[in-house]
Amino acid sequence: MYEKINEPLSIRGLKLKNRIVFAPTTMGLSEEEYLERLGIIAAGGAAMLVIGDVPVLRHSLFAKSLYSTKGFEFYRRVTEVIHKNGAKACAQLHVSDSDIKGMLRFVPGMLMKRITPDRLRELMNERTGPYITGIPESKIGKITASFGDAAVLAGKAGFDMIQVHGDRMCGSFSSSVFNHRTDSYGASAANRAKFACECIAAVRQALPDMPVEYKLAVRQENPHYGNAGILVEELPVFLPLLEKAGVDSYHVALADHSSLSDTIPPKSHPYFSGEGCFLKYCDEVKKYSSLPVCAVGGLTNPDFVEEQLTRSRIDYAAMSRQLIADPEWPNKTAGKNQDKIRFCVRCNRECLGGMMEHRGVHCIYDKKKEDVQ
């Protein structure tokens, strides 16, 4: 048994039974398939499942709203199936930084297949800066307050933790690549942190006892990776402000608005090819914060994960592709079956590939099981 992997962790009173969590993942599955998949992953021994992209606004084009009866019931079923199978549930609250009205102009091209998903991503990224820079301050206050409202509903739906999504709009406000404002929400690193801090503070004020994690989206230069999120060199400015606002832990990842193959890197990636490919960002966070840090990105090998935990390089580990490849990874590392782990090979063929082709997130191992049957 791996002792450190299976050591409990407490975050603001929430006890996680081990150090492994399921990272927020867009699945693209039907509702029933999605719930079944969550149940399988929870039963596999993960301490907590983070449910990605739960919208804080009343209306959302891409995800169910907590404010609607149908949406609230869906999230209640999500937490129910997770709890039933022995894990905790975390809601990743977010607000999109996409200019939805501007996006409508691209719909005909998408329908006619003249615009590919990758090209659409580029077009939307081009509009992010002007959109973020142009949001009126009066609207910003309503958006940040909605994080508190959504957090209350998430708590009522049964979630045990809130994660504030530090990418999307929080990340774009944080980044000088997109944020060209000259008011109190821009023009300096401290000002660019203000939006995220107000979102966190709204959650903390609404739910004083709820553990709050921040998805810390980090970007870098030389070489350039990530566009939204916090520049590595600006972490000393951002982290104290985020913690003053009420953060309890960090979930550290590469910032968005670059290629999906950067944020979800395959093993062939020219820069992020190794095991634990984003750990160097965790190292930077640890320099300036004593809060628990969760790593994500290419974590598959239990020996490697155990070593990072033992060295206190990280405090817990998030996995997506590995737990899709083998949901029993946590259970196997808790017993004597680690030699039977199906390791993710980071090919991205059926997971990221399935999502991009609107087939849903699956795994090459699924095909092998079908062939055996």
Curated annotation (Swiss-Prot):
The keyword Metal-binding applies. Coiled coil: none annotated. Keywords: 4Fe-4S, Flavoprotein, FMN, Iron, Iron-sulfur, Metal-binding, NAD, Oxidoreductase. One of its GO terms (molecular function) is 4 iron, 4 sulfur cluster binding. InterPro entries: Aldolase_TIM, BilR_N, NADH:flavin_oxidoreductase, OxRdtase_FMN_N. FMN binds at Q92, K215. [4Fe-4S] cluster binds at C344, C347, C351, C363. The record marks H257 as: Important for catalytic activity, assists active site Arg in protonation of C4. It catalyses: urobilinogen + 4 A = (4Z,15Z)-bilirubin IXalpha + 4 AH2; urobilinogen + 2 A = (4Z,15Z)-mesobilirubin IXalpha + 2 AH2. One of its GO terms (biological process) is porphyrin-containing compound catabolic process. Pfam families: Oxidored_FMN. Bilirubin reductase is a key enzyme in the human gut microbiome. The enzyme is essential to human health, as excess serum bilirubin can cause jaundice and even neurological damage. BilR is nearly universally present in the gut microbiome of healthy adults, while the prevalence of the gene is much lower in patients with inflammatory bowel disease (IBD) and in infants, especially during the first few months of life when infants are most susceptible to developing jaundice. Belongs to the NADH:flavin oxidoreductase/NADH oxidase family. This is Bilirubin reductase. It comes from Clostridium symbiosum (strain WAL-14163). The gene is bilR.
